Amino acid sequence: MSLNPKLQHWQGKTVWIVGASSGIGRALAEALHGAGARVVVSARQAALLLEFAHAHPGSTALPLDVQDAPALRSAVAQLQSSHGQIDACIFCAGHYQAMRAQQFGLDEAVRHLQINYVGALNLLDALLPQLLRQAQAGRGGHLSLVSSVAGYRALPKSMAYGPAKAALTHLAEALYQDLSPEGLGVSVVHPGFVATPLTAGNDFHMPALLSPAEAAQAMLDGWADGRFEIHFPKRFTLWLKLLRILPYSLYFRAVRRATGL
């Protein structure tokens, strides 16, 4: 069952990817540009964005930090002026550092929240009025938040990352309930392990590891089907979904057995 309008034709559509300098965001920008979209890429690393824009004619580099709410408001105003419509916005910005309770650091934990969750709130503050205006004019739009399977339930070494992603998933669910009746699409993406700069420092085995290009294709397929939740690879994520419904006595035992921690 489709929960969103199906996004199957990208030709001429304006797509803003926030967090597009590397990893999934960069691969998604490349795939959407190849599908004919007018891609706008944002992240902190201006040089990488300009390199992308130079190599992909018709795309736009818009450097910013998701922790800077005024910068996001300025970016939306600029896009409204230059592109008119924002057909889709994908929040891919993320920060990850493995953390267990024995190595807890307040500054690092707060940094996870500021980028992974508050960054999304800053985006909403800037973007929602524009999307609602588009909806009232019958033009619609789509907002997608990239969360993680680490947000399903607590996993070892995800003491800072997991709670921030769980909050992002909850936010997407709330947004869908409010915005779907307005004619706006909302989706949440739960990737498993993807070979990105964020996961490169992991010192443990990452099962069912995907390339960023494979992750981007899974997202495009999910939007084309009108899904609310897009999770991949299913051979890994379905097991985590099963863990999510187990009682705590079985859940903790299963996680310890699977991870050895």
Regions found by a protein language model. Give the residues of each.
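Conserved glycine-rich cofactor-binding loop
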Residues: 21-22
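Rossmann-fold cofactor-recognition segment
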Residues: 55-70
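Substrate-binding pocket helix/loop in short-chain dehydrogenase/reductase
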Residues: 100-113
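Active-site loop immediately N-terminal to the catalytic Tyr-X3-Lys motif
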Residues: 102, 153-159
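Active-site helix of classical SDR
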Residues: 124, 164
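Residue(s) in the substrate-gating loop at a strand-loop-helix junction
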Residues: 148
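C-terminal helical subdomain
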Residues: 188, 204-239
